[in-house]
């Protein structure tokens, strides 16, 4: 809807000065025409002649149920508790975490498998995204930001047990359970603060975007989302775009450079690209899925 009353393309701004250290925070929220994402531009400013600390985590609440699972990047194999006091394998926990015995091997990316209040934060990732997905409705939410500035990737839940259910009753009449999808800037853990020098300003951008039918995301930008799964010698390719994108080449190759599949297509939130490719005896880790524009520029892989 491009009507002026909707304000698409306008920047909705808010700012505040916190009372203890007089640090100023400013945020601008923008919905762009024909783009299925929310852009957030942030600035923090130290108004004093003294070094100050700050801690920044964006924190949307996400509805969850037995079909929900967190979507962490494929290079996240372990997660930390607050203050890095405890650590667990991820997504399959195999030990004690939050005093819960997962030694049989439990997928803690799934909300239904976490019985007690639990936080987990990714340990190192070179990817720019984190999010979650509901299998039964085939839809989810992603956060995208430069991982050099925004390394924090976290999920918090009250837990899918008696204690969590009691909190659901206290917090909502009808909406049911939720998780907090938390994204840290200049920090990958809590409470891990960052410094602002006297009169220093820091700024960054964050994006939140809905997506559908992609499943367990393997890579993403604000413009494209990729998934590549392999089962029974077949590669399942899914590509989602947050806006209309024409003449996009989808290419699947192996690590030797041999092209196994390529196709030029038009993408949009309504036109999700899906394909299946026979890969014979290829190992999944030897496959590379790439997107190129019509000039041959690599967009994502």
For each feature predicted by the language model, list its residue ranges.
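Beta-strand-rich binding/interaction modules
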Residues: 234-263, 287-288
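Short, hydrophobic/aromatic-enriched beta-strand segments in well-ordered soluble domains
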Residues: 14-17, 42-44, 200-213, 292
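Surface beta-strand/loop "capping" patches
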Residues: 214-245
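Single conserved hydrophobic/aromatic residue that forms the stacking wall/gate
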Residues: 1-12
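Asparagine-centered strand-capping/turn motif at beta-strand->loop junctions
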Residues: 43-48, 239-241
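Edge beta-strands of extracellular beta-sandwich domains
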Residues: 263-264, 296-301
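Short, aromatic- and glycine-rich surface loops/edge beta-strands on solvent-exposed regions
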Residues: 250, 281-296
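A contiguous, surface-exposed recognition patch within enzymatic or periplasmic domains that forms
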Residues: 36, 47-55, 59-201, 209
